[in-house]
């Protein structure tokens, strides 16, 4: 399970260190793709296989299902950690997530998310104010 928040930098070649706490669970190779809220999602290969199976059940007669699958899968790439624990994030994904030099990597249960730091801070500030309201709106959820 992935959890926590870590600040890292993207170098001039598009490489970024993955937090050491995440590297063990991700293994050497994992998948990154376009996520929601203008961030990138990162999944283990095993989790990615489960997502692929779920996606196959989406109705291809629905225009939104086709659009979502195209965006999600066309942005997906298998990445490999180098000896320094870095991955290379392709330009198209850096552009999608508006990644600048300063990035934040967070753990969200079954995935990691890679955010531009300023975008993350804005999202966090906005969400922090409504955290309790969001929790109340989640049906059948209890700690």
Curated annotation (Swiss-Prot):
UniProt-listed InterPro entries = MraZ (IPR003444), MraZ_C (IPR035644), MraZ_dom (IPR020603), MraZ_N (IPR035642), MraZ_sf (IPR038619), SpoVT-AbrB_dom (IPR007159), SpoVT-AbrB_sf (IPR037914)
Provide the Gene Ontology terms for cellular component.
cytoplasm; nucleoid
MF term (GO), any: transcription cis-regulatory region binding
HAMAP family per UniProt: MraZ
By its UniProt entry, which PROSITE patterns does this protein fall under?
Answer: SPOVT_ABRB
Q: What is its main location?
A: cytoplasm
Subunit description:
Forms oligomers.
Q: Which superkingdom, per the lineage?
A: Bacteria
Q: Does the keyword Transcription apply?
A: yes
Give UniProt keywords alphabetically: Cytoplasm, DNA-binding, Repeat, Transcription, Transcription regulation
Which NCBIfam families would you find in this protein's record?
A: division/cell wall cluster transcriptional repressor MraZ (TIGR00242)
Query: Which species does the entry assign this protein to?
Result: Staphylococcus haemolyticus (strain JCSC1435)
> What's a GO biological-process term for it?
negative regulation of DNA-templated transcription initiation
Give the UniProt subcellular location, in the record's own words.
Answer: Cytoplasm, Nucleoid
| Sequence ranges assigned to domain SpoVT-AbrB in this UniProt record | 5-47, 76-119
The protein's name in its UniProt record: Transcriptional regulator MraZ
Q: Is this entry keyworded Nucleotide-binding?
A: no
Q: Which Gene3D superfamilies does its entry note?
A: Transcriptional regulator MraZ domain (3.40.1550.20)
